[in-house]
């Protein structure tokens, strides 16, 4: 068994700055997150947690923001590629727990589809995926509505033992 932790944060752009994508879901909101890729903090944190658990570095090492190939990249594709490397190393997902930290917009209506997307991308059952959201009670940059943060914890199991 191996445990990994991931964290990501992106700040909001101006009104009309693009789509807000979290957990692979387009969420109606007046602002998008600024990023080299699509800015999906949930998938970035999950990808970092997976890579960390397998000692494969981090999302910035695998998909550097200095590489134009990843400009505007779909984070679901990045997650799938990272997971392909996890499988090649002899591990599979045990479970994934994600916490989205945002004052707005409300995430609860979108969490079921986020779980579906993650289970599909990680080739697992939805019972292996948990996504929850919280606020910081209007404290800090997320509380002021300046951006969104996300943490993820993952358990990998050896394919031969799992």
From Swiss-Prot:
Its cofactor is a divalent metal cation. The record marks 36, 135 as: Transition state stabilizer. A divalent metal cation binds at residues 8, 10, 44. It catalyses: 4-CDP-2-C-methyl-D-erythritol 2-phosphate = 2-C-methyl-D-erythritol 2,4-cyclic diphosphate + CMP. Pfam families: YgbB. Its EC number is 4.6.1.12. One of its GO terms (biological process) is isopentenyl diphosphate biosynthetic process, methylerythritol 4-phosphate pathway. GO terms for molecular function: 2-C-methyl-D-erythritol 2,4-cyclodiphosphate synthase activity; metal ion binding. InterPro entries: MECDP_synthase, MECDP_synthase_CS, MECDP_synthase_sf. PROSITE patterns: ISPF (PS01350). The keyword Nucleotide-binding does not apply. Keywords: Isoprene biosynthesis, Lyase, Metal-binding. Binds 1 divalent metal cation per subunit. 4-CDP-2-C-methyl-D-erythritol 2-phosphate binds at residues 8-10, 36-37, 58-60, 63-67, 102-108, 134-137, 141, 144. Pathway: Isoprenoid biosynthesis; isopentenyl diphosphate biosynthesis via DXP pathway; isopentenyl diphosphate from 1-deoxy-D-xylulose 5-phosphate: step 4/6. It comes from the Bacteria. Homotrimer. NCBIfam families: ispF. Belongs to the IspF family. Involved in the biosynthesis of isopentenyl diphosphate (IPP) and dimethylallyl diphosphate (DMAPP), two major building blocks of isoprenoid compounds. Catalyzes the conversion of 4-diphosphocytidyl-2-C-methyl-D-erythritol 2-phosphate (CDP-ME2P) to 2-C-methyl-D-erythritol 2,4-cyclodiphosphate (ME-CPP) with a corresponding release of cytidine 5-monophosphate (CMP). This is 2-C-methyl-D-erythritol 2,4-cyclodiphosphate synthase. It comes from Yersinia pestis. The gene is ispF.
């Amino acid at each position: 068994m191996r445990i990994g932790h991931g964290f990501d944060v992106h700040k909001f752009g101006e009104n009309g700055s693009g789509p807000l994508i979290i957990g692979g879901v387009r969420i109606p909101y007046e602002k998008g997150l600024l990023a080299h890729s699509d800015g999906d903090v949930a998938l970035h944190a999950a990808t970092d947690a997976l890579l960390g658990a397998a000692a494969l570095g981090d999302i910035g090492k695998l998909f550097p923001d200095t590489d134009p190939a990843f400009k505007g990249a779909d984070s679901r594709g990045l997650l799938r590629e990272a997971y392909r490397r996890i499988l090649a190393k002899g591990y599979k997902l045990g479970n994934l727990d994600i916490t989205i930290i945002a004052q707005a917009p409300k995430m609860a209506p979108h969490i079921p589809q986020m779980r579906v997307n993650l289970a599909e991308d990680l080739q697992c059952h939805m019972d292996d995926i948990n996504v929850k959201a919280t606020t910081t009670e209007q404290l800090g940059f997320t509380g002021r509505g300046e951006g969104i943060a996300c943490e993820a914890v993952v358990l990998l199991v050896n394919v031969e033992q799992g």
